[in-house]
Amino acid sequence: MKKVYRSAARMSTLLLFAAVAQMSMAQNTNTKDKSNSKEENNRNVMLNAASANGPREIQIGLPSADVNVLENGLPVTYATNPHGVNANWRSDASLSRVGLLKISETAITTGNIGYAVNSFTQLGQEGFHGQLQYKTNHFGLNEMSLNLNGGMGKGWYYSANMYQDFDPGTFELKSAEMQDRTQIYKLALTKRYNEGRGEMTLMGRYSKSHPVYTYATQSAPFIYVGDGSVQEYGKFALGTTSYLPTDPSMTYRDMRTGELRTTTMYDAAENNSKEIALYNTYNWDNGLSWKAALRYDNARGAFVYQTPMSLINLPGSKHGYIQQDAMGNWTPYTGDYVQTRMSCLNAGDIDELLFTSELSKRFSQSTLRLGLNQWYYHIDYASNTTMYDQSVPVDGSYPVRLVDSKARNSYFYDFNKNASEYYKGHENKLALYVTHDWDISPKFNLYYGARLEWQQLKGENAAVRNASGYVGRFADYHLGAVAPDGTRIVPTKLDYDWINYDFTAAATYKLNKQMGFTADFTYIVQHPRFENFSPATLPNTDKIVVPLGRAGVYYNNPWMSLTSLVSFISKTNNNSTLNLQHNSEIMAAPLTYDIQTLGWTTDVVARPVKGLEVHALLTLQKPTYKKYETSITFSDGYVGQINATGNIVAEVPQVIIEFDPSYQLTRSLRLWTSFRYFGKTYANINEAYYFNGRWETFGGLNWQVNPRLSLGCTVVNFLNQTGAKGSIAGAELITKDQAAGIKNVLMTGSYLRPFTVEISASLKI
């Protein structure tokens, strides 16, 4: 389970329905074009303000879960912790198409919640073809991908792909050369059947990735002014200054064996994957079509986090913090602040075998589809955590590690005390789904479907109980350790069988050629996934219910398409863990809560004059916590309590605006911009701290030099906005009354991606 170190259980940072797509385009087209009816349009999937190389995460007002990315009908990774999508997939020259599946289609075909990036591998074609893509930026990024494909005769085709990423990030690290070093290789061999009846493809993939950015860009210090704005701390420039110590080494206690080990953060973050897949499609003359996809993946997934915890304002010189100088001598630390950090070394060995099969039949006015998922996932996972202290340099120099000589004689302490995790075993999902897309009349279309899923989970974790309840974590916690009360930490057996189900229905009525009504409803019933069993407690295993309803109108004319929808979504039994902080003590508090969001979205695409296209979206929403209560008793007897029921969900804005104009200057030159406004967001669960609204801006020029060569220039954050976003470290227990008098105080949190100029080129061979 992705651990929650900040407020709101790592809540989605965007909206309820900023991702409500321009449905009117699908509604005024021929409903027999079913390839588009399952996908959303105008979502700029790869235009990402948070990452230079990953897909944009389109949120729906619920806690952040797995990022759904499919390739050839199968999830790129079964679970994204510890094996992230970016470690095994990039939107590069190896893909023939990238789209976005609707929430209803994602729910029925995968059982997951939210939109899904839908991608397809570039397979071989007749003759010889190739594409070379290259991207760089003014910070020194070098990203390239190459696809070569062609025919081999007698219906056989090949496709070979290579992806390389050398990304130093937006500031120089001393502990690693690159913030992202990723390499992905694919090889596909295709046999096409006679008379265009289909094809069979055998594909292999190897990937290796070091996502250093997951910990290098996680936090930075800033001055919280008190009015929702922040100021930079001294010469520490947000986004272009490193907040990591120069020493890359990390000492930790192995959760499985209890041994003390040393590694580097770069090595701990290594992901690798070796997979083989088989895809088949076959079409009969009677409108019957069969698709099947089978993939086996053997992988090591890993994430490293360097989470800021306490920020200590030192009382003059009466402290025991010391640092080592260049000669190895220990000297008193003379800075004003000390940052305590928790290192989380998440890693797991993974084997997954995924199979999906679909049989569809086209009739004169409808398409019927029957599908099967058989997904098996085995993992041996542990998260080893350790604490250390570092300086907070006001001059923008690199932080150094510190030792509190009054408490210890080494850098690292509290091994596995705060957020260590362990689980081992397998999860299996066997599901049957059916959909029917029916043009009842020229004016009325009805789409409906259902999914029935058997989820089996077997294995073990470290949720150990004593007479008083769960033992929980403690310093030097690991399998085989003995708690202060004498309880031995031994694996707890897990064995669950659940029935999950989803159903969806969508109706579109065309009042006339220009205007109509649309409504859809999706109801999802799930149970916890294996990663929810990672903490030292068992999660709430009651069913998780997600109802989603939308209704609205659309209007189309030759120069404009408009859709306006009201929406409702909720989710019960969100399992989460908060790391609550009191003085210098940090304790984990598990909780289960509900969320509910009401929203209204209007989406417009207009072409008022030749060459000009404008896309605009406005979302107003109210995401609120329901039954959000927890408490924890610290060692000094203080009881930390949180009751956020009725509060606005942290990190989620109530106002979203998107404005995307583009203009075709000539037949070969296109100028475009993209503006996204995110309104005021709360930076902790109690609505005590907040950040003012912010703009994310992009702009660029695309030049089609000739049919083979295209060039592009993109500017990220061209308004050069700097500041903080997300949540504030260690602020979970702060109330509104306590925060009222807090002004011009140093805090740590996440920040905006800095001004970046990117140059790209694509050459068709």
What are these regions (language model features)?
Residues 442, 559-561, 565-575, 588-685, ...:
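Gram-negative outer-membrane beta-barrel transporters
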Residues 29-75, 102:
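Extracytoplasmic beta-strand/coil segments of soluble accessory domains associated
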Residues 57, 74-102:
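Short acidic/polar hinge/loop motifs at secondary-structure boundaries
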Residues 27-29, 677-682, 703-765:
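C-terminal beta-signal and adjacent terminal beta-strands/loops
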Residues 129, 136-166, 171-243, 276-279, ...:
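Transmembrane beta-barrel wall of Gram-negative outer-membrane proteins
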Residues 348-352, 362-377, 382-386, 390-408, ...:
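Structural signature of Gram-negative outer-membrane beta-barrels, strongest in the C-terminal barrel
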Residues 129, 155-158, 195-200, 287-290, ...:
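Repeated loop/turn-to-beta-strand initiation elements of outer-membrane beta-barrel proteins
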Residues 190, 199-277, 302-344, 398-418, ...:
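Acidic/polar loop-and-plug regions of large Gram-negative outer-membrane beta-barrel proteins
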